[in-house]
From Swiss-Prot:
Keywords: Cell membrane, Lipid-binding, Membrane, Receptor, Steroid-binding, Transmembrane, Transmembrane helix
Spans through the membrane: 52-72, 84-104, 114-134, 148-168, 218-238, 259-279, 293-313
A Pfam short name: HlyIII
Protein family membership: Belongs to the ADIPOR family.
Protein name: Membrane progestin receptor delta
Gene: PAQR6
Membrane topology classification: Multi-pass membrane protein
InterPro entries, alphabetized: AdipoR/HlyIII-related
Residues on Extracellular side: 73-83, 135-147, 239-258, 314-344
Length: 344
């Protein structure tokens, strides 16, 4: 009879440095786990379990929203809706890629890096996906058909390449320069977010203090919730609070990466609601403007960006595979001090 045994968990001093997490002292899986061990570990309480499920379940929520909207009467046949549908594709992809990365990252040091390369690529595509509905529905009136509007989506595609490249490169610096690694990775994701949300920041500044007299430039409440969740997400990612203040207390539940996941998916939910609000409230006004990028152009841009990001990931993966097994990136040294784990 087939017998499945849950994998044994380890303390931080029992795993190579490449697997350490800041402030997480226990609940580590074996760094040579099989794929089956990794899947089984998602059903036992490890320091990754909540990370896995907080992105696995939202994947199905966003997929349900995509199918529900796409299956609506006449929704797919209306070109006005296409940017929203294309946005929802990477909105489904990024939590799924994150879930897979957290599930299979304990198979080996090389596999850990490759898993997160793919995770970063999916996040980069999500940053591009955000640009489609913002360009179609959320641009300020004074920006329509200007240079920024015309190049908004192509610039977002280039930003996705920069995001993937910097974030993947940051993993090569983790052990020798953890501070620089964290700065590069945080900047890699903060910059596309700031660029994508330029239309919202401008509309917010334009309407500040004007109450209800802002017309089509007014932001919905969902926009505010989205921006707040994004700010909180960035803070949690950069600070590693609360586990940094009490190492070992939040190993299984309540550490920053779990809270980061929850805030990220809540932010995406509110972003979707905000886009739907802009679609509805600005439709009559946008109908008088020139049509946005068609479905073929929208999908082609996303596909080309996905191909470019995969090439970047392939280049970093090839570099990783050529590295000797003895290099610090793949091994790390013994625990020094026993109180701090490295930053992810």
């Amino acid at each position: 009879m087939l017998s499945l045994k849950l994998p044994q968990l380890l303390q931080v001093h029992q795993v190579p440095r490449v697997f350490w997490e800041d402030g997480i002292m226990s609940g580590y899986r074996r760094p040579t786990s099989s794929a089956l061990d990794c899947v089984l570990s998602s059903f036992q309480m490890t320091n990754e379990t909540v990370n896995i499920w907080t992105h696995f379940l939202p994947t199905w929520y966003f997929l349900w929203r995509l199918l529900a909207l796409a299956g609506g009467p006449g929704f797919r046949a209306e070109p006005y809706h296409w940017p929203l549908l294309v946005f929802l594709l990477p909105a489904c992809l990024y939590p799924f890629a994150s879930c897979c990365a957290h599930t299979f990252s304990s198979m080996s040091p090389r596999m850990r890096h490759i898993c997160y390369f793919l995770d970063y690529g999916a996040l980069s595509l999500y940053s591009l996906g955000c640009a489609f509905p913002y360009a179609a529905y959320s641009m300020p009136a004074s920006w329509l058909h200007g240079h920024l509007h015309q190049f908004f989506v192509p610039a977002a595609a280039l930003n996705s390449f920069l995001c993937t490249g910097l974030s993947c490169y940051s993993r090569f610096l983790e052990l020798e320069s953890p501070g620089l690694s964290k700065v590069l990775r945080t900047g890699a994701f903060a910059y596309p977010f700031l660029f994508d949300n330029l239309p919202l920041f401008y509309r917010l500044g334009l309407c500040w203090g004007r109450g209800h007299g802002c017309g089509q430039e007014a932001l919905s409440t969902s926009h505010g919730y989205h921006l707040f969740c994004a700010l909180l997400t960035g803070f949690l990612f950069a600070s590693h609070l609360p586990e940094r203040l009490a190492p070992g207390r939040f190993d299984y539940i309540g550490h920053s990466h779990q809270l980061f996941h929850i805030c990220a998916v809540l932010g995406t939910h509110f972003q979707l609601e905000a886009v739907l609000a802009d679609m509805g409230s600005r439709r009559a006004w946008l109908a008088t403007q020139e049509p946005a990028l068609g479905l073929a152009g929208t999908v082609a841009t996303l596909v080309l960006a996905a191909a470019g990001n995969l090439l970047i990931i392939a280049a970093f993966t090839a570099t990783l595979l050529r590295a000797p097994s003895t290099c610090p990136l793949l091994q790390g040294g013994p625990l020094e001090g026993g109180t701090q784990a490295k930053q992810q």
